[in-house]
Design a protein with these regions (language model features):
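Conserved core segment of the aminotransferase class I/II
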Residues: 8, 256-296
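Glycine-centered flexible beta-alpha turn that most often forms the glycine-rich phosphate-binding loop
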Residues: 238
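Short hydrophobic short-linear motifs embedded
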Residues: 13-16
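Conserved core of the PLP fold type I
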Residues: 87, 92-231, 242-263
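N-terminal small-domain helix-loop-helix segment of the aminotransferase-like
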Residues: 26-28, 39-130, 137
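Short, solvent-exposed loop/turn segments at secondary-structure junctions
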Residues: 66-70, 132, 156, 207-209, ...
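Tryptophan (W) side chains
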Residues: 2-5
Length: 296
């Protein structure tokens, strides 16, 4: 189709076609918002990215982002290991791989989780682009519009944004100086069910909770596990900070006590480098197939 393009004084392009009237092209398709999916209409930029934009200003000392001190990394050793990997196994390392992640990496991840009392098989591990992708996969699998997700009050802003993108109703459960209060969890479950709502899972950060920083005691972990098991509610245990305690070891991960009801999320973003974007989900056997399909 032959077209003639003209630019008017307002620098808008006009395309003239022999079989159609003159149309004004301003660079944005007509009725663009109407073409979006319903869940995309209210989609907002990540609050975390907004924080990073402010933190990048030279006059700001930011305590907002959980950014590790990369100056402590053995850069020369990491460069040497990377070079050796590419030279000796580059054709494998740079090729397409399984959506579940490289088997040897999953074996190493199991060794890391063993430090927190978790006995896991590499076949149950799904490697993700940071644990943030794991949150997205879980939300995609579980959440329908208006389903309820229980979270600590306050909770990690990145998780809240993900749940809201999938149109979940987020119900906050009270905390104190020791973390999530079990009796408040019971009350939240009763109220939610009385209102006819479906609870899809409880999301919590037991170790050095973001943003409160508290460490959930072992007895509370057991009580919360018992409550959720009795109510048939999955627990999403997000544990980016578990290996960062130096004064005394953290209690064992909740996943160590319940392999069927706890979805465990881990990451190397705090212990190695966030730029690697390596996270993982350790899922119950009943969920593995859905998670693998969602990740591919």
């Amino acid at each position: 189709i032959w077209q003639t393009w003209l630019m008017d004084s307002g620098r808008n392009l006009r395309v003239v076609k022999s079989d159609s009237p003159v149309r004004i092209h301003t660079g944005e398709p007509e009725n663009l918002p109407e073409r979006f999916a319903h869940r995309a209409v209210g989609m907002k930029a990540s609050e975390i990215r907004s924080l990073f934009a402010v933190a990048s200003r030279p006059e700001i000392v930011s305590l907002a982002g959980g950014m590790p001190n990369l100056s402590a990394l053995p850069m020369e050793m990491m460069a040497s290991v990377t070079q050796k990997l590419i030279l000796e196994n580059g054709s494998e390392a740079l090729q397409y791989g399984s959506g579940q992640g490289h088997p040897k990496l999953r074996e190493q991840i199991c060794d890391v989780m063993a430090l927190e009392g978790i006995k896991a098989h590499p076949d149950a591990v799904i490697v993700t682009t940071g644990s943030q992708q794991a949150l997205d996969l879980i939300s995609r699998i579980f959440i329908d519009p208006n389903d309820v997700v229980l979270v600590e009050a306050p909770s990690y802003v990145g998780a809240l944004g993900t749940f809201k993108q999938y149109e979940a109703q987020v119900v906050h459960v009270a905390m104190d100086q020791d973390g999530l209060i079990p009796s408040a969890l019971i009350d939240a479950i009763k109220t939610t069910k009385a209102n006819g709502k479906k609870i899809k899972f409880l999301y919590l950060i037991p170790n050095y909770q973001n943003p409160a920083g508290v460490l959930l005691p072992a007895d509370r972990r057991s009580e919360i596990l018992d409550i959720c098991r009795a109510e048939e509610i999955f627990i999403v245990e997000d544990n980016p900070y578990g290996l960062l305690g130096f004064d005394k070891p953290s209690p064992n991960a909740m996943r160590a006590s319940d392999s069927e009801n706890v979805i465990y999320l881990g990451t190397f973003s705090k212990t190695i480098a966030p730029g690697l974007r390596i996270g993982w989900a350790l899922v119950p056997q009943s969920l593995k197939e859905k998670m693998v399909i969602a990740s591919e």
